[in-house]
Amino acid sequence: MAETLEFNDIFQEVKGSMNDGRLRLSRQGIIFKNSKTGKVDNIQAGELTEGIWRRVALGHGLKLLTKNGHVYKYDGFRESEFEKLSDFFKTHYRLELMEKDLCVKGWNWGTVKFGGQLLSFDIGDQPVFEIPLSNVSQCTTGKNEVTLEFHQNDDAEVSLMEVRFYVPPTQEDGVDPVEAFAQNVLSKADVIQATGDAICIFRELQCLTPRGRYDIRIYPTFLHLHGKTFDYKIPYTTVLRLFLLPHKDQRQMFFVISLDPPIKQGQTRYHFLILLFSKDEDISLTLNMNEEEVEKRFEGRLTKNMSGSLYEMVSRVMKALVNRKITVPGNFQGHSGAQCITCSYKASSGLLYPLERGFIYVHKPPVHIRFDEISFVNFARGTTTTRSFDFEIETKQGTQYTFSSIEREEYGKLFDFVNAKKLNIKNRGLKEGINPGYDDYADSDEDQHDAYLERMKEEGKIREENANDSSDDSGEETDESFNPGEEEEDVAEEFDSNASASSSSNEGDSDREEKKRKQLKRAKMAKDRKSRKKSSEGKKGKDPNAPKRPMSAYMLWLNASREKIKSDHPGISITDLSKKAGEIWKGMSKEKKEEWDRKAEDARREYEKAMKEYEGGRGDSSKRDKSKKKKKVKAKLEKKSTPSRGSSSKSSSRQLSDSFKSKEFVSSDESSSGENKSKKKRRRSEDSDEEELASTPPSSEDSASGSDE
């Protein structure tokens, strides 16, 4: 027989909400840990009095009763697990795990039985439903009625608000069945009534959340916060954890009370009650109980008369009444010697405390993250201009918390702490490459060389120089944005001619070198622009006279049916119209679609016929264009063979016109294709006289005639 049994995905009903967790049975007892809150139910083996197995909504359930009247119910078991649990109970707890079915007759009359902290409504020997009396918040009586109201759980999608019982009168004298019923409920119910005197009162305590100053009255079963505007009554059963945290300035203390369910102020929910104390403030406290009652109730944890620091008195009383341990920071110590780290969360600055089993951030908004719910952490490096880093935590549920603006000096301490707690570090490979002193990270400020930043600065300078050069030399450059008949080779020829013209000028050696450097830059930029334009011109250069592609059957039908769809659905958007048309097309019968398929086939045949005619006419024109291009290239090669006379003619033509154009450039424009002639006919007729005067002086004509020979 196994010493322990463990079950995952077991559910516990808490005021209408099903919370999942893990159940572990051992020789010593039964432990259930809530996955959401981390709360642990620990049932000692000697306290168990009864175990019941029954069918419930989530499969099968286990109901446990203890000697002090507490009832624990866990659901989510499989039917096959009964034998294993039954044998375990017999062997280790010496209890018989009984099977008991619920009544499903649907009757609304029966017998009410009170057992421990449970109200059971039975029909015969079978229970119909059970009500934990600790969930009752109010009990009121009428003539023959008793009404129970319940505490609400914000996590429950559907909540039970109240139950009303009709109690018939009896013939017994002196016994009121309605009052007897109500007293049985109130004796075990969690009804918050400020009856009697408080055990003690703390006056005008500073509260950070909810903000204000409150008088705290300590009652046996609940805590009463009384402020100028709001009152809060907090049952001790809703307190999950207590934290006592020293402030970074070493002069103040935080006392944090974790609550589930939270207290509410309008639509705002407070999961944490945070009190702020000064270490220098002392108090003398006298409990409103005699010494015998104090000794019997608190067993030496409290005395009738106590004195000391205010924060010590509050924490000591709360620990005794709530019966929870107080969590304090562990052995973590930051760069400044404090047990916390200054950082920012969301829009507010606060303090992050690394604890032995989690992290807690105070104070706005307070956050508590347990180690067992952390998936991984990440050290996010800050920018090069800051001296800080970010600490990111992602939970197993996918929630991410980012604590930013942490001083870089805290990096080493925090990294060592996370490593010691064996938390998964997302960027571990990067961090293990850092030396133990973390000097490389610590020196990552604005003085460090950033190669990417330097490269961006250099590129910006080059762009600025090019912009200045283009504005200074605008008289020497031609319009590069309009060269429709020009190839990439023509760009190089144009700049070569400019280079020769500048070299023949009467400038110094340094000016010539500077001019060549600028011209090479411009040539490179022009080539880049040409390469970018080339891809776009491929799309823009589509012949408008070419036949259009045929439409598909769906598009033909859509164009014909568009107006009808609009009239059937007035105000429909384009997107919705397309979706609606797609739905109609899918729902059409095959016979109706065949009509549009035939139309699409006819359109395809017409397109193929038109394309053949178009390709035939285009082939003849392309042959003529190729022959003209060959003549153009031949003329350029011949011109290169006689550069001396050409250069002198260029220098003389430059004095006449700011924009230089050689004769072969003019002639190449004149010998362009028939398509370009029709577009540029009007422009050439206006500029022909100016080009003859400015671009072809007598010396240029002589050189051209010499090359033709």
UniProtKB/Swiss-Prot annotation:
The cross-references to InterPro entries, in alphabetical order and at most eight, read: HMG_box_dom, HMG_box_dom_sf, PH-like_dom_sf, RTT106/SPT16-like_middle_dom, RTT106/SSRP1_HistChap/FACT, SSRP1-like_PH1, SSRP1/POB3, SSRP1/POB3_N
Positions modified as Phosphothreonine?
Answer: T170
Q: In which compartments does the protein localize?
A: Nucleus; Chromosome; Nucleus, Nucleolus
Q: Which residues in this protein are found as N6-acetyllysine? A: K233, K413, K542
Q: Name one GO biological process term.
A: DNA repair
Q: Which segments of the protein form a coiled coil according to its record?
A: none
Cross-link Glycyl lysine isopeptide (Lys-Gly) (interchain with G-Cter in SUMO2): which residues?
K90, K296, K364
**Name of the protein this chain belongs to:** FACT complex subunit SSRP1
Source species of the chain: Rattus norvegicus (Rat)
